[in-house]
Amino acid sequence: MNDRPRRGTSVHQVLATLGYGDAIGNEVLGIQRVLRAAGYESDIFVETADPRLESLTRDFRELVGESHPDNILIHHFSIGSKASRVAYALPDRMMLVYHNITPPQYFVDIHKLLVRFCYHGRRELGAYVDRCDLALGDSEFNRLELEGLGFARTGVLPVVADFSHLDVTPNDMVARDFDDGWTNILFVGRIIPNKRIEHLIRFYTLYKTRFNPRSRLLIVGSSQEFDRYQAMLFDLVRRLGVSDVHFTGHVSNEELAAYYDVADVFLCASEHEGFCVPLVEAFYKRIPVLAWAKTAVPATMDGAGVLYEHADPGEVATLIDLVVSDSDLQERILRTQDAALERMAARDLAPTLLSLVDRVRAGPRLAPTAVARDFWQQFDTTERVAELRLVRPAIYRALPTATRASGITV
């Protein structure tokens, strides 16, 4: 590795929002610790931050005054972010970190605004192809998406899971309510369409009616901005006539730890994931995991747990019964999960991150990006025209030819 002197050398991070206790927020803070320990000046520039973390951040507009062609920006890409667009225009070298954008089709008829955001976000990501010195996925699945978009220089900065939020005293009220000899099937994650909560409900319904009436489904996670989807799930529960389905909403760390503690099996039917942190949280809490083998899930499972190939309620209900009723099988599954967790723990963020930084420092400089003052206005106009072509073709055909052919000036 190159020597790291680092006086006058800065590797800053820029992102839209720094959240408290979420996977990206933990990663950002971990990256900063590694960079500062290695001697780099490293600040976190954001548009907004959780009040508990505001003191650790700077306003993204201050980044302009800190900018220098020898600096490196670690840019955590997000949809339509002002901070991202400022970073694009600066002369600093750039390492883009891609945490995945859910395909917009999951939100059709559920969240129209998010359909638009995700559609434009995936297209906006393509504008960075020639701007990035290095584009990083936080999983191999995400790296392959970047490669498919045309990024020539890619790599993986793997998620290093932090379980400290689970090392708390569990909420005893949750334990009293649900640690009662019944079989608890747990899912943790946002109540959002790509998680396919409807599959979980159907799997559970068949398991409860065919194998085990003394069972319940615990769905732990926020439905914020997805009330319509949650209402559809409530209606599905009603139509199936199944009981003991519990939607908890957002929970505290103490409650989350308790839900993991009372769980007998962790069931995941997510169809689109860039990583899926709750899978490895369940490993950490030693709960057998059953998950649908889709997108990044098999790589995250890393040979552990149980993967199922088809979202067939009969097959999955039978799998649940096999795992719940066979203690020897449970122990074998847990050993595979323990081994996967050990492999994950052995991945040291510091050498991986610093070698990627060195790779950028040692690489040839990209041609400077000259950005017209109205570059992003032109980009947004072009995207609106492209959206019309896809969803309102009659209006698109009525546009003047010059508007239809509009492009971006740099």
Stretches found by the model and what they are:
Residues 136, 176-195, 201-204, 218:
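Conserved donor-binding/catalytic core segment of Leloir-type glycosyltransferases
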Residues 306-313, 322-327:
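Conserved acidic donor-binding segment of nucleotide-sugar-dependent glycosyltransferases
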Residues 279, 288-291:
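Short hydrophobic beta-strand element within catalytic cores of glycosyltransferases
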Residues 46-50, 214-231:
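Glycosyltransferase donor-sugar binding loop
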Residues 258-263:
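Short alpha-helical donor nucleotide-sugar binding micro-motif in glycosyltransferases
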Residues 230-254:
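Nucleotide-activated donor-binding/catalytic signature segment of Leloir-type glycosyltransferases, i.e.
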